[in-house]
Amino acid sequence: METVQFKDWVEDAATMLVEHCDGPTVLVGSSMGGWISLLLASRREFKDQIKGLVLVAPALNFFRPHYHQMAKELNLEQQATLERGEVVAVEDEWGVTYLRKSFVEASAELELDLSQPLEVSVPCRILHGVRDASVPYRNSVELMETLVGTNVELVVRKKAEHRFSERKSLEVLAQSLEDVIRDI
């Protein structure tokens, strides 16, 4: 807990690709998994392997704004604990979130610059719900505009939330995966 960093999660995913995925691969990533999928798809070493993406409510560059929002809501003792570099556990909608300043600072090096074209050109479907309280769906609009690929589609569902897990959303997810597989 004290030493794990976001880059470790990214490297774990890269290791899975190298060790367990032979041939063309379509990555399906939800929330931070969408961010990780984009980071991997933008790496030169995976250009020949990753052939498609399906991203559900991708939480790009999520940690800093989320951390600062949560830190504002802490009491003074908890804020001082964070400033000393220690971990603070906070109950939230996902269960317990562990806040650590060094984790957030280190994750900044993996943030994607959406003011520049993002060099990912594989078929990509981005799915997002308007009712997503964790990641605004407008972030996915910005991502779609940034990707250099031309086979990119964004599906925004008015009644869907962050998990995109209601029956109709799951049908859209399955169809999107089929579309990407067909297009590669």
What are these regions (language model features)?
Residues M16-L74:
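Primarily recognizes the serine-hydrolase "nucleophile elbow" in alpha/beta-hydrolase
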Residues A14-T15, L38-L40, E109-S115:
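A generic local structural motif
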Residues D48-R125, G129-T146, T150-V156, E161-I184:
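The alpha/beta-hydrolase serine catalytic core
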Residues M1-C21:
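Catalytic nucleophile-loop/oxyanion-hole region of alpha/beta-hydrolase
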